[in-house]
A protein has these predicted regions:
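...with weaker cross-activation on analogous glycine-rich loops/strands in unrelated enzymes
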Residues: 63-125
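Cysteine-nucleophile protease catalytic domains, especially the papain-like/related folds used
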Residues: 2-82
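Primarily a LysM-type cell-wall glycan-binding module
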Residues: 126-146
């Protein structure tokens, strides 16, 4: 499925600001993945990547995470008071923000293309630390602004 957005998704006003202070450091990047980031499940030490259903104790022996079957229910089970399903184009309830899940089915016969999942989190604003040598042009390029 290809999703083409012609206008920004509505904000609830509760979206967190994007910052690299915690999640963007070596410990944050090395021990957390997109799912942990999307639902705010930061850990300083994690032996394996966080997957939907893990916190709720749902066994994942038969799920490949390359299709959507049962994944929304697993996310809700992991985060019962924080998550509910909504349409991308509607504003979230107060104190909530959008998280979107995507899966890539991959090719089971190709070891390097077995598929995976990815989560995106909607932010209301971005905290950007200007670095020495930054120009208006490369900052605009970073934010994809013309």
């Amino acid at each position: 499925m290809i999703l083409v957005m012609s206008k920004p998704l509505p904000l609830s006003g509760s979206e967190p600001n994007y910052t690299q202070r915690l999640w963007g450091r070596t410990v944050g990047v090395g021990n957390n993945n997109c799912y942990a980031y999307a639902v705010g499940d930061y850990e300083k030490m994690r032996l394996q990547k966080s997957v939907p259903g893990e916190r709720a104790g749902i066994r994942n022996l038969s799920h490949t995470y390359t299709n959507c079957k049962g994944l929304p229910q697993r996310v809700i089970a992991d985060n019962p008071k924080k998550v509910y399903t909504a349409k991308a184009t509607e504003k979230c309830k107060p104190n909530h923000f959008k998280v979107m899940m995507f899966v890539a089915p991959g090719n089971q016969r190709n070891y390097f293309r077995q598929g995976d999942f990815h989560f995106y989190k909607q932010h209301g604003a971005v905290e950007y630390k200007v670095k020495k040598g930054n120009t208006y042009e490369n900052i605009a390029k970073f934010f994809k602004v013309r």
